[in-house]
């Protein structure tokens, strides 16, 4: 690992660069094969497993030959998402039932995204939305709400008034004047104030839920969005951009966070994932799970750690193509210099893979094979070194990243921001890249304010994760260098060789 960021530039005079640039605009058909278990579910087309055994593609890392950033030069924008068949439906049965791991597949669900009906895309100058517009009002008196209390947004005063009334079982003198309750008058008529609390939906039982009901959230967001659009028309353009990216995201990535979370929480009509926690359950899983990239008779003679590692490689290759397809739908991306498009994808794909991998993880394990299986964290750690070290940093990142409680609409913009990073080594024309990213950052900031009004620091926290992701990729490349030295019979997929070449 002697290279630095400055050493990792792509030589525009080299044959490798010519091959890379040629392949970026030409679809390369790859042979579909089978693989073991890749704990992500977003991808590129498959490549024959026999390539993995071809030692001409070993860790000696040959020149660029097979990058499949296909058809990047053809933009296509669609404002209406196309429904996809759910890839997780299978015609097999799961027999293994483990009480020890039932609790592992339980996490908090993620609320679906909210968007307005506007879909036109614009590129307007940035104007910061007024902070006052983002202040949510108390549903009872109109004062600034301090949070979601007893089922509605309420200020501290009305929250305390309602709590005292309920706990002390207070009964107020009846008033038939239907007094108006607002910030200055709320203490004048306790009867009408309590009736207003009940009328807007405050309930002592609602405290246990802790989260805003989705219908209430959508109504509130609609009110806020309408106010913002009237005073700041540019925000409507940013939300339209966010909707476009979300639609493209849904079409590009089969297993979304919403689907993954539904599986992990048992809130899906599909069968529960088969739990793989040791060698015996792994063997049973190979019989029960429809693995997409493995031919069992050919592969069972290989060591388990190597088979899983090869499966991860193939799933990564699939990921590159889906990320590439998504990138082509980011407004302005296909108009960039072709060489810069290659560079942005080369440096960005693995950061995005690990971002989306977090959606499939909880602290105990990860979904595999399009949600058909669940491989435990402890089993992955038990693989012999250095293979047992590969996934642990991803789990550590996922636990912290998932604590931000992002949904797919947030992730759609975030991964676009990752792709359009103007500080990647070797870029030829940085200015247009930074202009696109600036627009995406504005859309992300507004999206987070609308979708997470209670998390004022979320935007800053999310940007910090971009630094964490780069560190994870650097450590991953370092582990690959260890494998290169210790596993002389191992081979690395040709496409991944090209991406990893001179990468950090």
From Swiss-Prot:
Record keywords, A-Z: Activator, Biological rhythms, Cytoplasm, DNA-binding, Isopeptide bond, Metal-binding, Nucleus, Phosphoprotein, Receptor, Transcription, Transcription regulation, Ubl conjugation, Zinc, Zinc-finger
Cellular component per GO, a single term: nucleus
Family matches, as Gene3D superfamilies: Erythroid Transcription Factor GATA-1, subunit A, Retinoid X Receptor
Cross-referenced InterPro entries: 1Cnucl_rcpt, NHR-like_dom_sf, Nucl_hrmn_rcpt_lig-bd, Nuclear_hormone_rcpt_NR1, Nuclear_hrmn_rcpt, PPAR-gamma, PPARgamma_N, Znf_hrmn_rcpt
Renumbered ranges of motif 9aaTAD: 494-502
Predominant cellular place of this UniProt entry's protein: nucleus
Ways its activity is controlled: PDPK1 activates its transcriptional activity independently of its kinase activity.
Residues found modified as Phosphoserine: 111
Cross-link position per record: Glycyl lysine isopeptide (Lys-Gly) (interchain with G-Cter in ubiquitin): 251
Transcription regulation listed as a keyword: yes
Keyword Mitochondrion listed: no
DNA-binding region: 135-209
Gene Ontology BP, a term: positive regulation of DNA-templated transcription
Subcellular location: Nucleus; Cytoplasm
Role played: Nuclear receptor that binds peroxisome proliferators such as hypolipidemic drugs and fatty acids. Once activated by a ligand, the nuclear receptor binds to DNA specific PPAR response elements (PPRE) and modulates the transcription of its target genes, such as acyl-CoA oxidase. It therefore controls the peroxisomal beta-oxidation pathway of fatty acids. Key regulator of adipocyte differentiation and glucose homeostasis. ARF6 acts as a key regulator of the tissue-specific adipocyte P2 (aP2) enhancer.
Subunit structure comment from the entry: Interacts with FOXO1 (acetylated form). Heterodimer with other nuclear receptors, such as RXRA. The heterodimer with the retinoic acid receptor RXRA is called adipocyte-specific transcription factor ARF6. Interacts with NCOA6 coactivator, leading to a strong increase in transcription of target genes. Interacts with coactivator PPARBP, leading to a mild increase in transcription of target genes. Interacts with NOCA7 in a ligand-inducible manner. Interacts with NCOA1 and NCOA2 LXXLL motifs. Interacts with ASXL1, ASXL2, DNTTIP2, FAM120B, MAP2K1/MEK1, NR0B2, PDPK1, PRDM16, PRMT2 and TGFB1I1.
Family: Belongs to the nuclear hormone receptor family. NR1 subfamily.
Free-text comment on this protein's domains from its UniProt entry: The 9aaTAD motif is a transactivation domain present in a large number of yeast and animal transcription factors.
Protein name per UniProt: Peroxisome proliferator-activated receptor gamma
Gene source species: Sus scrofa (Pig)
């Amino acid at each position: 690992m002697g290279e630095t960021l400055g050493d990792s530039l792509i030589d525009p005079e080299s044959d490798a660069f010519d091959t890379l640039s040629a392949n970026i605009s030409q679809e390369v058909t790859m042979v579909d094969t089978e693989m073991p278990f890749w704990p992500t579910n977003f991808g590129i087309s498959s490549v024959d497993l026999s390539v993995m055994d071809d030692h001409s593609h070993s860790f000696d890392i040959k020149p660029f030959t097979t990058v499949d950033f296909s058809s990047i030069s053809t933009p296509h924008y669609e404002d209406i998402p196309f429904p996809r068949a759910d890839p997780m439906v299978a015609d097999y049965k799961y027999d293994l039932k483990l009480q020890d791991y039932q609790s592992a597949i339980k996490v908090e669900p993620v609320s679906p995204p909210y968007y307005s009906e506007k879909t036109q895309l614009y590129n307007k100058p940035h104007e910061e939305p007024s902070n006052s517009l983002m202040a949510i009002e108390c549903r009872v008196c109109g004062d600034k709400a301090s949070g979601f209390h007893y089922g509605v947004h309420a200020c501290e005063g009305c929250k305390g008034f309602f709590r005292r009334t309920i706990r002390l079982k207070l009964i107020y003198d009846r008033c038939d004047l239907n007094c108006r309750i607002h910030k200055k008058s709320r203490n004048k008529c306790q009867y009408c104030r309590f009736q207003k609390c009940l009328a807007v939906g405050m309930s002592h039982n609602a405290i246990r839920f802790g989260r805003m009901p989705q219908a209430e959230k959508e109504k509130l967001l609609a009110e806020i969005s309408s106010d913002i659009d009237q005073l700041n028309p540019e925000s409507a353009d940013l939300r339209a951009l966010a909707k476009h990216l979300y639609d493209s995201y849904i079409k590009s990535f089969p297993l979304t966070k919403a689907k993954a979370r539904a599986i992990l929480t048992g809130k899906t009509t599909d069968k529960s994932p088969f739990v793989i926690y040791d060698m015996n359950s792994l063997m049973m899983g190979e019989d029960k799970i429809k693995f997409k990239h493995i031919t069992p008779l050919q592969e069972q003679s290989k060591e388990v750690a190597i088979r899983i590692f090869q499966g991860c490689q193939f799933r990564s290759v699939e990921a590159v193509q889906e990320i590439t397809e998504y990138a082509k739908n980011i407004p302005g991306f296909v108009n960039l210099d072709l060489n810069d498009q290659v560079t942005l994808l080369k440096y960005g794909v693995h950061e995005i893979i690990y971002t989306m991998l977090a959606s499939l993880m909880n602290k105990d394990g990860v979904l595999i094979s399009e949600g058909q299986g669940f491989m435990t964290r402890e089993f992955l750690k038990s693989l012999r070194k250095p293979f047992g070290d590969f996934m642990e940093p991803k789990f550590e990142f996922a636990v912290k990243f998932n604590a931000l409680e992002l949904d797919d609409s947030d992730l759609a913009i975030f991964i676009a921001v990752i792709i359009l990073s103007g500080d990647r080594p070797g870029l030829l024309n940085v200015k247009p890249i930074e202009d696109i990213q600036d627009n995406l950052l504005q859309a992300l900031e507004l999206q987070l304010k609308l979708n997470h009004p209670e998390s004022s620091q979320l935007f800053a926290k999310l940007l910090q994760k971009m630094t964490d992701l780069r560190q994870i990729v650097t450590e991953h490349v370092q582990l690959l260098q260890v494998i290169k030295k210790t596993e002389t019979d191992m081979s690395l997929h040709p496409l991944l060789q090209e991406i990893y070449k001179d990468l950090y």
